[in-house]
């Protein structure tokens, strides 16, 4: 009987880590995937505390350690990482990692790409732009990343309605609900399809 080991994934995050925590818990039984590492570029980001509470190793690194050295690459190799999940990660992934993990780096964007994507379009900036434009719907896009911001292949989208009176804050809450509900499952389905 062939026993397959779980697929190792790493989460890159820059903030509080609610999506990271949700992903870690979703794959907690380790039957398909195992979050083996959380990587963060901000020393005061709460995501590292969430990882600690869930017994997942976390490492803080600098922008230059990501861009100009093999430090991050070595951490990923040591853990046998096969897929990288970007969960609120605000730095651009260098080309060498894009090549090494070709079509195996997944991001979530808080809008329905191709609208409201690109450099500088993250978090509240996105929600403010959507409300200012008078859009009637928004949502999330889970996508594979490539060398251009928010241009990679779309894996999954989910929508929400924007009501009269919605603000960037109320829209952010709706988007967060979609992220919590759908992001882990979209990751699972993509990995099942591509592994």
Question: Can you annotate each of these PLM segments?
Answer:
Residues 1-195:
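One-carbon transfer enzymes
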């Amino acid at each position: 009987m062939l026993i397959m080991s779980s697929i190792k994934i790493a989460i890159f995050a820059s903030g509080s880590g609610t999506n990271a925590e949700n992903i870690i818990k979703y794959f907690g039984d380790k039957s398909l995937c195992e979050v083996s590492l959380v990587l963060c570029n901000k020393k005061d980001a709460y995501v590292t505390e969430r990882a600690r509470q869930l017994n997942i190793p976390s490492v803080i690194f600098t922008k230059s350690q990501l861009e100009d050295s093999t430090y991050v690459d070595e951490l990923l190799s040591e853990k046998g990482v096969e897929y990288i999940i970007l969960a609120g990660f605000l730095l651009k992934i260098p080309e060498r990692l894009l090549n090494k993990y070709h079509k195996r780096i997944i991001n979530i964007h808080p809008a329905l790409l191709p609208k409201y994507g690109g450099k500088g379009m993250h978090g509240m900036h996105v929600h403010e732009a959507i409300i200012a434009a008078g859009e009637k719907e928004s949502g999330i896009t889970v996508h594979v990343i490539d060398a251009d911001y928010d241009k990679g292949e779309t894996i999954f989208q989910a929508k929400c309605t924007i009501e009269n009176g919605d603000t960037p804050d109320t829209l952010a809450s709706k988007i967060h609900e979609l992220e919590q509900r759908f992001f882990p499952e979209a990751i699972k389905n993509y990995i099942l399809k591509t592994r």
